[in-house]
Amino acid sequence: MDWNRIEGNWKQFKGSAKEKWAKLTDDDLKLIEGRREQLEGRLQERYGKAKDQVRQDVDDWLKTLH
């Protein structure tokens, strides 16, 4: 999945993001607005993971999207 597609259609994908990362709040999802760096930053804050691990988690999530 190309990130540009997610960014342009964030409303379609944010539900999937919320399912994957339940600690993300609705305000987080609104703030992210499809920007990968915002998503990764929020995931680091909410889950206390290292940047590299969060990046891998997001890459893995992308592979599940169609």
Swiss-Prot record:
InterPro entries: CsbD, UPF0337_stress_rsp, YjbJ, YjbJ_sf
Family named by the database record: Belongs to the UPF0337 (CsbD) family.
Record protein name field: UPF0337 protein bsl1473
Pfam families linked: CsbD
Superkingdom to which the source organism belongs: Bacteria
